[in-house]
Swiss-Prot record:
Belongs to the XFP family. It is an enzyme of class 4 (lyase). Its EC number is 4.1.2.-. One of its GO terms (biological process) is carbohydrate metabolic process. Its cofactor is thiamine diphosphate. Pfam families: XFP, XFP_C, XFP_N. It comes from Clostridium acetobutylicum (strain ATCC 824 / DSM 792 / JCM 1419 / IAM 19013 / LMG 5710 / NBRC 13948 / NRRL B-527 / VKM B-1787 / 2291 / W). NCBIfam families: PRK05261.1-2, PRK05261.1-3, PRK05261.1-4. This is Probable phosphoketolase. GO terms for molecular function: aldehyde-lyase activity. Keywords: Lyase, Thiamine pyrophosphate.
Length: 796
């Protein structure tokens, strides 16, 4: 095909004069990056450096900074030359100064933070605030214009970058991958993400592996293997690597500029060919391996040992602050080596010749709208979830699979948003297993590798489902990148294995918390997580697949951000999920069932229940407005089944016992109103649970979580049954028995907490013990649960 070379404006043409300007710009970025580490005053060294100009405590990092400033300067050139829509994602840890320095130089920072102006006072504030109490982080934190990846917990940069370009055909994400970061599990698997990028409908990712050779105190693996081995590694992963290696700035500027022109034109040519010819075959996308010294341009030796090109450059290269001035002269020499007098005018502003190098307006990477995704967010079109209602003539009379019913609703969400292409489903090869079958009626899995029919199923070059990579890390990272750039989606996975990404969820929650306090950061769509194949539904999976701990992990996070829902049936799930899709800036966790399950609520009942989050189920209660003898509560699908079964036993054997049944769908309702926005007042809580009557609580997760949530409540007569880390491959009911969540143990607990029952209670406890023995004998002989368990029906 015809090349696009020569079809762009001459601006950015590689000449010795232009490269000298880029070098000057790079020096300016390096200078103020060092200044942010050390300086409180005298930011351009217009007088001799003195101890009083220094911070009292120097905190921050240097090693990755100059290499990234080098990359940033050269990306600015190709953005202007090719009129690119590009964002910058930084993966290395502690690279905070990079985007701060560069966004300050191009003016974005001062537009976002007018108090950090482009003059003497602004430059002093810029330096003071870095890693300073009341200031900014040493990472590319949410406060940093242009950032969508903080780089604190490492490994997610490439996944975020791919998520950002899904359905953004004109966007290029320049993703700098640290060579230390490249050793993490999530990053190591992210190189495979190129197998899912459609060159017609998606944008492009340009990975730039920054090989500076060292981590905190160790060499990096990829920097120490032979070049041909490294090249083959990336070629084997489907990339076309270009190497830019060296330490002489003049040579490196020319090589980097030439290489960026080549890879940019390759990307644009790939896209042009794909879009003109509807060619979705997987291309060999280019990438860059940039090998430069760690701490490049910094002190070569400190205290007689190597610094530049050594692990010693990782953090603060020179130990110097207001109280320790032995290295003050060396710091001054280092700062002056950048020749700030050539770079800034008399008003402490970057000289016009260098300002001209930066893109303008939203073409600046720090000002790109995709890096503030809430600005681009469009409301998701959703059908009326009530149209998907399961008919429930009487409680328990209908049996359905909740996730199958949800799949019908999700199918139509996909259909309604086909033209906007702003909704995706992510999962690690579990969409079919998790019963979202109906979704495949309207879309397929996006997959750019070979398709072998009829052996394969539902694979296509273009689809709304991205679930063909068995990596929870990559799926979560893709979804986060997709959300951060202004779209919608959800991640459905096995409950136990969502724990694999619980730390990623934590990091995203931190991002949401901070950005919610920044007026210029607009709210993004919520992170919606569906945890199914849950702890109580094991079948062939067993002990390894049992972990409901994500609930506790979520609860500990900022109450303004996190929500946890445990719908007990399909209508409740539909109402909850629709609600979650319309929230913004939240983490919504839904724990749900996928197996055949009795249905309890009509759609009207479910809507009211979800709106309240917690309610008395009158049809399962017989206290009828009186003070109950006991409250039986449930939270979760299986606990609700067993709690209702326990109620039927109590009604049969102790008909005079006044039982109140309370179901919890919004777990945060259990918290006091001053601890969570969804929390109940003490008055409302006591109206449900009384102040002193025994509460037998059947819970989906670990029992201590309910004790934690209700710690400040008046009624301490609470007895929680939940998961006790017991169970293996066994029958569904035996899982409950082993963890004492079954109906028989619940009834025993009721009786044991009502001593007034006397002999009547003792006989019922004996009957329950007999049933437990019968159960154990039966499953070991027959291999399935007792007929009275499998055929149980709700009745009063």
């Amino acid at each position: 095909m015809q090349s696009i070379i020569g079809k762009h404006k001459d601006e950015g043409k590689i000449t010795p004069e232009y490269l000298k300007k880029i070098d000057a710009y790079w020096r300016a970025a390096n200078f103020i990056s060092v200044g942010q580490l050390y300086l409180l005053d005298n930011p351009l060294l217009r007088e001799p450096l003195k101890p009083e100009h220094l911070k009292r405590k120097v905190v921050g990092h240097w090693g990755t900074i100059p290499g990234q400033n080098f990359i940033y300067a050269h990306l600015n050139r190709v953005i202007k030359k090719y009129d690119l829509d590009m964002i910058y994602v930084s993966g290395p840890g502690h690279g905070g100064q990079v985007m701060v320095s560069n966004s300050y130089l191009d003016g974005t920072y001062s537009e976002v933070y007018p108090n950090v102006s482009r003059d003497l006072n602004g430059l002093k504030k810029l330096c003071k605030q870095f890693s300073f109490p009341g200031g900014i982080s040493s990472h590319m934190a949410p406060e940093t214009p242009g950032s969508i990846n903080e780089g604190g917990e490492l490994g997610y940069s490439l996944a975020h970058s791919f998520g950002a370009v899904f359905d953004n055909p004109d966007l290029i994400t320049a993703c700098v991958v640290g060579d230390g970061e490249a050793e993490t599990g999530p990053l190591a698997t992210s190189w495979q993400a190129n197998k899912f990028l459609n060159p017609v409908t998606d944008g492009a990712v340009l990975p730039i592996l920054h090989l500076n050779g060292y981590k905190i105190s160790n060499p990096t693996v990829l920097s120490r293997i032979p070049k041909d081995e490294l090249e083959k590694f990336f070629e084997g992963n489907g990339w076309k690597p270009y190497f830019v290696e060296g330490e002489d700035p003049e040579t490196m500027h020319k090589l980097m500029a030439e290489t960026l022109d080549i890879v940019t034109e390759e990307i644009l040519n790939i896209q042009k060919n794909a879009r003109e010819n509807n060619d979705c075959s997987r291309p060999k996308w280019p990438m860059i391996v940039l090998r430069t010294p760690k701490g490049w341009t910094g002190p070569k030796f400190v205290d007689g040992v190597p610094n530049e090109g050594s692990f010693r450059a990782h953090q603060v290269p020179l130990a110097v602050d207001r109280y320790h001035t032995e290295n003050l002269d060396q710091l001054e020499e280092w700062l002056k080596s950048y020749k700030p007098e050539e770079l800034f005018d008399e008003n402490y502003r970057l000289i016009p010749e260098l300002e001209e190098l930066t893109p303008k307006g939203n073409k600046r990477m720090a000002a790109n709208l995709h890096a503030n995704g809430g600005l681009l967010l469009r409301e998701l079109r959703t059908p009326d979830f009530r149209d998907y209602a399961v008919d429930v003539p009487t409680p328990g009379s209908t049996v359905k699979q909740d996730m199958i019913e949800l799949g019908k609703y999700v199918r139509d969400v996909v259909k309604l948003n086909e033209d906007t292409r702003n909704f995706r489903i992510f999962g690690p090869d579990e969409t079919m297993s998790n019963r979202l079958w109906a979704v495949f009626e309207g879309t397929k899995r996006q997959w750019l590798s070979e398709i072998k029919e009829p052996n394969d199923e539902f694979l296509s070059n273009d689809g709304r489902i991205v679930d063909s990579m068995l990596s929870e890390h990559l799926c979560e990272g893709w979804l986060e990148g997709y959300l951060l750039t202004g779209r919608h989606g959800f991640f459905a996975s096995y409950e136990a294995f969502l724990r694999i990404v619980d730390s990623m969820i934590t990091q995203h929650g931190k991002w949401l918390k901070v950005t919610s306090q920044l007026p210029w950061r607009k709210d993004i769509a919520s992170l919606n997580l569906i945890a199914t194949s849950n702890v109580w539904q094991q079948d062939h999976n067993g002990y390894t697949h049992q972990d409901p701990g994500l609930l506790g992990h979520i609860v500990d996070k900022k109450p303004e951000i996190v929500r946890a829902y445990l719908p007990a049936d399909a209508n409740t799930l539909l109402a909850v999920f629709d609600k979650c899709l319309h929230t913004k800036h939240k983490i919504n966790l839904l724990v749900t069932s996928k197996h055949p399950r009795q249905q309890w609520l009509t759609m009207d009942q479910a809507v009211k229940h979800v709106e309240q989050g917690i309610s008395i189920w009158d049809w399962a209660s017989n206290d009828k407005g009186q003070e109950p003898d006991v409250v039986i509560a449930s939270c979760g699908d299986t606990p609700t089944l067993e709690a209702l079964a326990a109620v039927t036993i109590l009604h049969e054997h102790l008909p005079e016992l006044k039982v109140r049944f309370v179901n919890v769908v919004d777990m945060m309702k259990l918290l006091p109103e001053n601890e969570h926005p969804h929390g109940l007042s003490d008055k409302d809580y006591n109206a449900l649970f009384t102040t002193d009557k025994p509460v037998i609580f059947a819970f989906h997760g670990f029992a201590h979580l309910i004790n934690q949530l209700t710690y400040h409540r008046e009624n301490r007569n609470l007895h929680v049954h939940g998961y006790m880390e017991e169970g293996t491959i066994t029958t569904p009911f035996d899982m409950r028995v082993q963890n004492k969540l079954d109906r028989f143990n619940l009834v025993k607990d009721v009786v044991e907490n009502l001593p007034q029952l006397g002999n009547r209670g003792a006989h019922l406890v004996q009957l329950m013990n007999d049933k437990l023995v019968e159960h154990n004998q039966y499953i070991r002989e027959v291999g399935e649960d007792l007929p009275e368990i499998t055929n149980w029906q709700w009745h009063v």
